[in-house]
Amino acid sequence: YHIYASNIDGKNSMDLTPFDGVKANFSNLLKDQRDFVIVDLNKNNPEIFEPYKLNIVTGELTQLYKNEDASNPISGYTFDKDGNLKGYTQQEGATNYSLYYRLGENEPFKKMLTTTWQDNFYIAGFDYASGNPHQAYVISNLESNTDELILYDFETNKEIKKVFSN
């Protein structure tokens, strides 16, 4: 798969990911940076995807993180609205997934929890209204037999409240 850009009238089409054998997936739209999107490409290794910031006007790509462990690959990345990598989920072995999170751009990632393939715990989006950059809405079934929407504080690694449960 490739990502293309064109004018609104369909003219001036440009392949933004012109790499043979490389698949491209949209990851994040950056609302406040209209010329940029974050995409996942398997450019360095066909077995694993890594995030890139893509300028949709010029086609310039900037790699944002390296996913170098093919035996325990990163299966998903979480970015904030400014395009900062806040966390990722890494497969560990055949059936476990660990969520890693960092408090700041220059901080190391810390493992927050590990789940199995049967469990859900992933960041749906950050709560920008709270003023706390580490508050996020999480989808989880760890405390229920169905998915719940939870407001979670990653700085304290604790649930703040259940927003919705069915």
Describe each model-derived feature in a short phrase.
Residues 1-166:
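Beta-propeller folds
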